[in-house]
Amino acid sequence: MKAISRVLIAMISALAAAVAGLFVSAGTSHAGLDNELSLVDGQDRTLTVQQWDTFLNGVFPLDRNRLTREWFHSGRAKYIVAGPGADEFEGTLELGYQIGFPWSLGVGINFSYTTPNILIDDGDITGPPFGLESVITPNLFPGVSISADLGNGPGIQEVATFSVDVSGPAGGVAVSNAHGTVTGAAGGVLLRPFARLIASTGDSVTTYGEPWNMN
């Protein structure tokens, strides 16, 4: 009986440890700061761009075509400018993908989003020309979408899916469940999300995330 009790206790302890590990893993996966990169530009400002909470949810394609990959993208991109003249910074914040595909005949990518799926984060809209007291996200009709022909594979292509004008020393953009598809790709498709900050002076810095497999 003592031997059986020891076995049962060992099994329960192992199961509890496995469950605890599962909860820890699920709680930290794709949450928080994913990646960042900094650059000192020509005006001695430090430009930093970051990706946060990136999640690409690959789903079974609605057209049931074996050559189609479909996903929904959620996440945030932030930028920070430090140094002389940071308050006067102006530029563009871009989000997009590097897309890798092993074989294809004319791959095409489609990506779309509508407000309130996209939101300016930490943007200053209290001064001219807005003079508002809170952040608003007006509707875009019928929405915004991009479509691009990636050509024949194999290959790696980079596509900027959307961009926003930014100003000031810090800010960001958030996107929730933006819809994307790749058509005409045989085999697995890898998506590497990126965020890019481009200053009005032409300086730019890009941070790339881990690749996501859209099988």
From Swiss-Prot:
<dbReference type="GO" id="GO:0006811">
    <property type="term" value="P:monoatomic ion transport"/>
</dbReference>
<keyword id="KW-0472">Membrane</keyword>
<comment type="function">
    <text>A constitutively expressed secondary porin, forms a water-filled channel which favors the permeation of cations and less efficiently phosphate. There are about 2400 porins in wild-type, 800 in an mspA deletion and 150 in a double mspA-mspC deletion.</text>
</comment>
<keyword id="KW-0134">Cell wall</keyword>
<dbReference type="GO" id="GO:0005576">
    <property type="term" value="C:extracellular region"/>
</dbReference>
<protein>
    <recommendedName>
        <fullName>Porin MspC</fullName>
    </recommendedName>
</protein>
<keyword id="KW-0732">Signal</keyword>
<keyword id="KW-0964">Secreted</keyword>
<keyword id="KW-1134">Transmembrane beta strand</keyword>
<dbReference type="GO" id="GO:0009279">
    <property type="term" value="C:cell outer membrane"/>
</dbReference>
<dbReference type="InterPro" id="IPR036435">
    <property type="entry name" value="Leukocidin/porin_MspA_sf"/>
</dbReference>
<dbReference type="GO" id="GO:0015288">
    <property type="term" value="F:porin activity"/>
</dbReference>
<comment type="subunit">
    <text>Octamers. Probably forms a goblet with the wide end on the exterior of the outer membrane and a central channel. It is not known if mixed oligomers of MspC with other Msp subunits form in vivo.</text>
</comment>
<feature type="signal peptide">
    <location>
        <begin position="1"/>
        <end position="31"/>
    </location>
</feature>
<dbReference type="GO" id="GO:0046930">
    <property type="term" value="C:pore complex"/>
</dbReference>
<keyword id="KW-0813">Transport</keyword>
<dbReference type="Pfam" id="PF09203">
    <property type="entry name" value="MspA"/>
</dbReference>
<keyword id="KW-0812">Transmembrane</keyword>
<keyword id="KW-0406">Ion transport</keyword>
<dbReference type="InterPro" id="IPR015286">
    <property type="entry name" value="Porin_fam_mycobact-type"/>
</dbReference>
<keyword id="KW-0998">Cell outer membrane</keyword>
<comment type="similarity">
    <text>Belongs to the mycobacterial porin (TC 1.B.24) family.</text>
</comment>
<keyword id="KW-0626">Porin</keyword>
